[in-house]
Amino acid sequence: MREIVSNALSVRHAAELAALVGYIDFTQPLVSSLVDRVLDIASVLTAAPSYARVEARPEGHPWHVDTGSKGHMGWCCLSASVLLTPPESFTGGGLYFRDEPETAVYHYRDLVLYDSDPGNEHCVTRSRGDRRALIMFFRGVENG
């Protein structure tokens, strides 16, 4: 499963979240509104070990699925992210899915949701400039 919810955040709200680099609580009002959008699509839980953070990571992420490279996030059944800075504020930093390796996703203000199925293996390329994203990892109801 992979879905995109377009324009999930306003320009102003994206900028507000971009200023909050680090771990962030699911009850933060802007994050909470995004979680509500996630819950419209999937049954997930926000209790630990689920977590969210605003990330500024110029080194990107190598190819992986969100259960962790060593299985350390085996509880993760759904991930979601929103690019919080406009693509013109950085270079590189594309989100790629293995099944579409030539297509970069620059999901500014769009909520991208995907499950932890191996078919959703993805990476984020190195970036220069100001690239920030909200990333959220959820455990499933069945993982209780």
Where are these regions (language model features)?
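Fe(II)/2-oxoglutarate oxygenase catalytic core
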Residues: 1-111, 119-144
